Every structure is written in C-alpha cells, then in structure tokens.
Amino acid sequence: MNQSLLAPFGTAIERVEAGLNALRQGLGVLVVDDEDRENEGDLIFAAESLTNAQMAMLIRECSGIVCLCLPDEKVKALALPPMVENNSSQYGTAFTVSIEAKVGVTTGVSAADRVTTIKTAIADHAKPSDLARPGHVYPLRAQPGGVLTRRGHTEGTIDLMQLAGLKPAGVLCEVTNPDGTMARLPEIIAFGALHNMPVLTIEDIVVYRKSLLANVG
C-alpha cells in the first residue's frame, strides 16, 4: 500500500479512529484492502443507521452489488445457506443466498426497499421467515476472528462496527470510476475528499486490533 498517499489521513491508528468516529455519527467510510489482494476500496456504512440517501449513493457511485456483512451467528439465526455449496471464488468471499424483506417492499430493488430489507434482517429478533429468498441484497458471512483471521472487507466491516460500539452489521459496495472501472487508491482518496469521508485500510484495522491486544496483554 502506498503509505505516502494515505499520510494526510494520519497514522494507521488515527485513520481507524477517524473511521470509527464517522461510523458513530452515521457517516460513511472508505476501506482499501491490500494491493496484492483485491486492490479495491469499499464504501461502508453502519447497517443500523443506513439511510435511503446513503443506499442511493452506494447504488449510484459503486458497483451496485450492495452487500450486508453479518457475523456467523446472525447468518445462522437467519438460516441463510451459502450461495453455493462449493465456494471456488478467488478469495472465498462468503456470499449467502440473496434476500428480500417479505413486508414493506415492492420490487425490492429501489434504495428504500433495499434499506427495508437490511433493517429487517438486522433486527434483534429477526426470524428466517421475515425474509424472502432470493432478493436484491447480498449477505456476506464474516469469519470469526475478523481481519486477524481473514483480511477481507467483510471482516473489516464487522470489526469496525464492533470497535465503534455499533450493532455488528455493515453495508458495503465496491467504489467504481465513472467509466465503470474499479477505483484504485488515488481515485478512492479523491472520492473521500469530495464526500468528506475518512480513508483507511484493512492493514490499519489489523494494526489497530493488534495494538488493543498488546495493551490488554
């Protein structure tokens, strides 16, 4: 990762702190993974405070494949099976079957409908019967252990929500350029500056979590 580009956002610890503060205020953050991995940046919002306007931004500015990151226990509680029996994707991204709220949506594809689906899924007492399958929201199952187990955006999202003291559920979508190509770090930093969003990396979250563990030790 080109640290010189990230320098204006502070140290790894400061970047994570800025991201946590933004999430607590109901704002978005941009998280970039390793250059030798997917090398992409995701726009992430806390699921519990997600607004229709934020969902519209995810649809408009990103790839359109809006995903709901959930911890393993929530995926089990909702009885969401894997999208495929044998996951052969390059990075083992743990998609479950797609979902739709059974109540309160029309076609399910509008920003408002997708927000309704997400709020239905993350409700404390949500039941499998509250959701139709398939739908227009794509849940992702986070590995237990977070980024210390798997350095993916899914795990990074859940880690950030937990570190911020929020419900462990986040919404993400990959940032794209206007021509449809994937945004890389320079474009993601420009996007963050335009929309006043903090930028941090998966590596930053790893450093932050390890520092917390060291302090506990």
From Swiss-Prot:
GO cellular component: cytosol
Species per Swiss-Prot/TrEMBL record: Shewanella oneidensis (strain ATCC 700550 / JCM 31522 / CIP 106686 / LMG 19005 / NCIMB 14063 / MR-1)
Cofactor note: Binds 2 divalent metal cations per subunit. Magnesium or manganese.
Enzyme class (EC, first level): lyase
GO biological process, one term: riboflavin biosynthetic process
Assembly, per entry: Homodimer.
Binding of D-ribulose 5-phosphate, residues: 37-38, 42, 150-154, 174
Statement: the UniProt record of this protein carries the keyword Nucleus: no
Homology family: Belongs to the DHBP synthase family.
Chaperone listed as a keyword: no
SUPFAM superfamilies assigned: YrdC/RibB
EC number, as in UniProt: 4.1.99.12
GO function term, MF aspect, one: magnesium ion binding
Keywords: Lyase, Magnesium, Manganese, Metal-binding, Riboflavin biosynthesis
Annotated binding of Mg(2+) 1, by residue: 38
InterPro entries: DHBP_synth_RibB-like_a/b_dom (IPR017945), DHBP_synthase_RibB (IPR000422)
Cofactor section: Mg(2+); Mn(2+)
Descriptive protein name: 3,4-dihydroxy-2-butanone 4-phosphate synthase
